Amino acid sequence: MDNKIRTTIYLMPGMAASPKIFELIEFPPQYKIIYLKWIKPNVNESIKYYAKRMSELINDDQPILIGVSFGGILVQEISKHVKVKKIIIISSVKSRVELSLSMRFAKKTGIHHLLPLNLIDDLEKILLFVFGPSIKARVNAYKKYLSERDPEYLKWSINQIVNWKQIKYDKNII
């Protein structure tokens, strides 16, 4: 490749997911690829301040931000702290108006606070018990791709999605 400046793409996985979800995606050589990982949220930290901390990991001018699901919400929040070339969201929403009925129900009722997220570490054992050895390949995929299992992080993430305030969004989001 000649001396052209490459555009950097930052990839943000969805809630509980590891950057390994992107491992089979190939990008043309004119792009520099950086995989973002979830960092532990501070106690009572808003998504606004979390995004500010995450934005400190971005060291390139006008990158492209790509986020999946909750990662799509986060890259939109990061873009409020960093000038970006483009935001691409996958299986995500652009504003709270687009949140699913179940998320809106959770916001109104607070039912999301009752989820037994401490069982997440036992998910493989539960699935193997219920479905038997035939589910082993799927369980191994869960271990590989859904590696963020800290119950406090998961509670924080769900709460941030349910209570996300964004109504107006960048019209250039893909």
Regions found by a protein language model. Give the residues of each.
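Helix-loop "lid/cap" segments that line or gate small-molecule binding pockets
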Residues: 122-135, 145, 161
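Active-site signature of alpha/beta-hydrolase-fold catalytic machinery across serine-
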Residues: 24, 77-78
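Flexible "cap/lid" loop of the alpha/beta hydrolase fold
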Residues: 83-116, 162
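Active-site catalytic motif of lipid deacylating hydrolases and related acyltransferases
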Residues: 2-61, 109-120
